[in-house]
Amino acid sequence: MKKGKKIPVVRENIKMKKALKIISDKKLGVLIVNKKNGFTSGIVTDGDLKRIAQKYEKFDDLEIKKVMKKNPMSINEDTLAATALSIMNQKKITSLCVHKKNLSKKTIGIIHMHDILQSNIN
């Protein structure tokens, strides 16, 4: 699981030009979108960004909150890696937000399918 500064987190009002740089720098293919209070409001993948760029003429100035997927899939920090992998396979996604037991709207980490596969846990 990636934690702290390794998590690609942005605020809802960030412009796409800056979001694109962050998703590229963090190399996870995903951005977690947070409200001002730190609660997670959405997610955007690199695939989403490619599709959005083709749709909108003024892509660079677009705010991420207008195109993010709301209520991203998340797991409790105590969830087994095999369970997380199963969820990713079922939902056909590559990343899950991770939260503390009592704070399901506050992302504390992100787990990527490759992290699980590289650790040989399945």
Predicted features along the sequence, with ranges:
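Histidine- and aromatic-rich ligand-binding microenvironments
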Residues: 15, 48-49, 66, 115-116
